[in-house]
Amino acid sequence: MSALHVSRVRALYRRILLLHRVLPPDLKDLGDRYVKDEFRRHKTAGSKEAERFLQEWEAYAAVLWQQANESRQNSTEKACFGISLPEEKLNDFRDEQIGQLQELMQEATKPNRQFNITESRKPKL
C-alpha cells in the first residue's frame, strides 16, 4: 500500500472518531468500537475492496458531519443521527455483512440504560 493510501485511511479514521464525539455516549461507544473493528478487519483488503470501503466510510463521515451541524443549529430539538439503507445497498451486502448489520441494529436500539439509576434500599458501608 502506498503512503498516500495509508495517510488517507488514518485521516478518515481520526475524522470519524472525532465526529463520534457529538453522538450520545452510548452511540459514541458503539460507533467507536464498530469503526475500530471494521478498519482493523479491512487492513489487508485488496485495492478494489479498500477503495469501496473508503468511499462508504467517507460517505458516512459526510452524513454524520451534516447531521452534527444540523443538531447544533437546532439545539432545541432532539438530535437525530443515521439514515435508512436503500434496498439496492442491502442487496450488495454479503451474508456476513447482513449479520453484522443486524447485530449493530440490535445493539443500537437497546434501551438506554445510561441514566437509569435505581436507589438501593440497603445502606452502603
Swiss-Prot record:
Keywords, sorted A to Z: Chaperone, Mitochondrion, Transit peptide
Transit peptide: 1-30
GO biological process: mitochondrial respiratory chain complex II assembly; succinate metabolic process
Chief location: mitochondrion
InterPro entries for this protein: SDHAF3/Sdh7
Cellular component, GO, one term: mitochondrial matrix
Entry's localization field: Mitochondrion matrix
Ranges in coiled-coil conformation: none
Pfam families: Complex1_LYR_2
Superkingdom: Eukaryota
Function recorded in the entry: Plays an essential role in the assembly of succinate dehydrogenase (SDH), an enzyme complex (also referred to as respiratory complex II) that is a component of both the tricarboxylic acid (TCA) cycle and the mitochondrial electron transport chain, and which couples the oxidation of succinate to fumarate with the reduction of ubiquinone (coenzyme Q) to ubiquinol. Promotes maturation of the iron-sulfur protein subunit SDHB of the SDH catalytic dimer, protecting it from the deleterious effects of oxidants. May act together with SDHAF1.
Assembly and oligomerization: Interacts with SDHB within an SDHA-SDHB subcomplex.
Record-stated family: Belongs to the complex I LYR family. SDHAF3 subfamily.
Descriptive protein name: Succinate dehydrogenase assembly factor 3, mitochondrial
Annotated organism of origin: Bos taurus (Bovine)
